Swiss-Prot record:
Active site (record annotation): 95, 167
E.C. numbers: 5.3.1.1
GO biological process, alphabetically ordered: gluconeogenesis; glyceraldehyde-3-phosphate biosynthetic process; glycerol catabolic process; glycolytic process
Principal place of residence: cytoplasm
Subunit: Homodimer.
Protein name per its UniProtKB record: Triosephosphate isomerase
Length: 251
């Protein structure tokens, strides 16, 4: 089965609403002929303008987080129905920065993934190990555990629609990239884990990204690996030229 490569930008806390709209308007024409699925993950306040700017193009829009409840006394949070009403396509769940700074756990990731599907959003589920964990040789064990908990209670059809992003924490924003072989190995472990849980068909269908200092220079080699179906791109997704090259890695 051929899986459509997904080039997703995670802007993190960057760009004002005006800057975001200008960026997407400029990006549209540049990636119109891309074979990849192009996604921009923008701050909450940028979502309305970016969804509008992306209309009629092949750019999909992602939120960077969501709450698992529909509504309620959760000051500062944003719910699935709010994102769905805006026309958001994807939501990034469990990014390492959310886990590190904001108390995200494997259990809250699972609740958010269920909420995403309930409200028609596709989750981009982030998993990955720290440098210490890699050095201790527990990468495979840890990532398998994160995947299993994140997907707990989901149907096979839901899992096929999900995206998993392997982001080694030691390679995020550090300039260190996992070697192609390291990235491929862990993405392969994730696919094998999905196969054990949901069978061969689901494992073949689900898209697994690599995230961790993906840039215009290394995207093609990474995306051509058998088990890597694109990237969750940080800093390089904030630069038009770089993100265009990543989205069109095969041209």
């Amino acid at each position: 089965m051929s899986r459509k490569v997904i080039a997703a930008g995670n802007w993190k806390m960057n760009k004002t609403p005006k800057e975001a709209v200008e960026f997407v308007q400029a990006l549209k024409g540049r990636v119109a002929d891309a074979d990849t699925e192009v996604v921009v993950g923008v701050p909450f306040v940028c979502l309305p303008g970016v969804v509008e700017a992306a209309k009629g193009s092949n750019i999909k829009v992602a939120a960077q987080n969501m709450h698992w409840e529909e509504k309620g006394a959760f000051t500062g949070e944003v719910s699935g129905p709010m994102l769905a009403e805006l026309g958001v396509d994807y939501v990034i769940i469990g990014h390492s920065e959310r886990r590190q700074y904001f108390g995200e756990t494997d259990e809250t990731v699972n609740k958010k993934v269920h909420a995403a599907f309930k409200y028609g959003l596709k989750p981009i589920i982030c998993v990955g190990e720290s440098l210490t964990q890699r050095e201790q040789g527990v990468t495979a064990e840890l990532v398998r555990y994160q995947v299993k908990i994140a997907l707990l209670g989901l149907s096979a059809e839901q899992v096929k629609e999900a995206v998993i992003a392997y982001e080694p924490i030691w390679a995020i924003g550090t300039g260190k990239t996992a070697t192609n072989e390291q990235a491929e190995e862990v993405c392969g472990i994730i696919r094998e884990c999905i196969k054990e849980l949901y069978g061969q068909d689901v494992a073949e269908a689900i898209r697994i990204q690599y995230g961790g200092s993906v840039n215009a220079a290394n995207a093609a080699e990474l995306f051509n690996m058998p088990n890597i179906d694109g990237g969750l791109v940080g800093g390089a997704s904030l630069k038009l030229d770089d993100f265009e090259k990543i989205a069109k890695y095969n041209k």
